[in-house]
Amino acid sequence: MRKIIGFRTLCVGLGIWVGTVVVSAQGEFKALPWSQSTAYNSYLMRDVHRQFASRQSAIQQAFTSPAGMQEYLEGCRERYKQIVGTFPEKENLNVQVVGKIQGTGYHIEKIIFESKPGRYVTVHLYMPENMTVPVPATLELCGHGLNGKGSSSHAAMLMASNGIAVLVVDPIGQGERLQLIDREGKPLTRGATTEHTLLNAGFNLLGTSLAAQEYWDNHRALDYLLTRKDIDPERIGVYGSSGGGTQTAYYIGLDPRVKVAAICSFFSTRERTMELQGPSDGCQHIPYEGREQLEVPDFALMMAPRPLLILSGKYDFVDLWGAQQGFAELQQCYKVLGVPEKVDMLTVETGHGLGTEKRQKLVSWFKRWLKDDQSPVKKSAQDRFRLSDMLCTTKGQVNVSMPGALSIMQENVNQLDEWASKREAFLSKGKKTIQARMLDLLGLKDLPDHKIRIEATGHDSMREYEQYKFQLIREGEMPVPCILIMPSRANADSPVELRLQEEGKGTYLSEYANFAAALTEGKILLLADLRGLGETTDPAFYTDAKYWNREYRNAMVSMHIGRPIMGQRVVDILTLLDFCSEHEFLKGHPVMVFMVRLQFMLLIWMKESAVWR
């Protein structure tokens, strides 16, 4: 154990909380003078609201002139590029057309291509027949159904019957592109959203996101579409519903090849969604959106002045009020740019998804802007196909069918291995360089100052020790609850054991046997709850069981606002160390930090005067 003297330190924990979070037996070991189970989430949401308010001020100013509006949109686009990350060099798509299914007035081509080496993408191309080529075309980006493109798409059939080709793309984790599968290709997770969430955690460690990777695959799908002589490259659209609506929103602002778009059953405001239901699954978020003041309507606004349609249901779980507020911004934007007719919204007496009425409006919108045709939508035959006949792969999954296929997990491991030498080079740099980069990753602009306020909240005298309760307050941060155990045998040289554990301090203190030996040895015990643990643990029912653990919603909100939980908890540790430096019972005593059921790699930066023993 290292002993730190004169220790103004920064303890940075890099890693993840693992294991099942257990509700602490707090009871008499509560140190906060208040009780509010959702306090931590409320604290985080204040930043969400502040960021949204700042964004509102900026967009209202942009609405005052066309030049201001264009400047706002370009600013959104540049900030979006920063958070979506970089993409690989384009390589050969290695397209394979593996089959053809005949429909009524159209045919479906079954196609496989590589968006990057080893990443196979399965698609269906609904191609209208008896049409003058080249024809207009659109991408259909799939919602969250586990079967992805599945056995058929009613919207694609309707589009094809009206002279518009449709390329339906299997996203990562759906259709024939499941990643978490057994040797036979059977899914190991509960639905697409669970797989998306688990895969996104791995992507986040590499500085990207599942949403960004979906963008890349969709971009390459459009690249393929434009290689075809029977497709008109000047008449291209994109649409999607639910998770496909998410993909559409994230896609359209960065690809000028898209001339018309429609977002169904996704469009609302992020602020409103986080308030009502909390963060969604892993493909629905790109880290730091809030920090960069990017709202869901901003991704749609980047489509302007190209035609855009919003499709909503009055009884959708996607909040209609937020959708209406966002659409009002779209209307204002398009009006300022002089093209109010190029944005529209349909709200129907239904819930989630792309139902009949929405499909009719969708095809009508695309006919108008891709074909200059406002005639009534032609009905399509409701053809039915067997799922087995519609598969592009021999075994139903690319990762067990295609030679050289790489799972997303293997891709990520390969990327980590590729970066190994870069990590070694980085760690050879000076302390200040490393510290600056770590602070950036943790969402800390700088180390907090020493200013904390110590509030005593309770005191109990026991036979062998005195028990003191405190809440430690640092401006702008969550208060840190802690309990100090001063044994009767303590002296000027007694070490302080600062104990931090996943279950909270109450679990440790509720069993006398846990600390009896420390009392006998005269050790001073300081037990505390880092934010989101112990006294401020988020109630489990606010996070769906399919997500990581009960910390999911607060972890995702923290990433959204640009303040990862790990960085926030580093500030809590600093607050505790400042407490040890300032409180009359503790100043001058050596401090040892124990992490229990918290997996950390500890990096400690010390003042020049600090001494290690």
Question: What is each stretch, according to the model?
Answer:
Residues 9-21:
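Bacterial N-terminal signal peptides
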Residues 197-198, 204-205, 259-301, 305, ...:
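Mobile cap/lid helix-loop segments that gate and shape the active-site cleft of serine hydrolases
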Residues 126, 169, 239-241, 246, ...:
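Generic beta-strand/beta-sheet core signal
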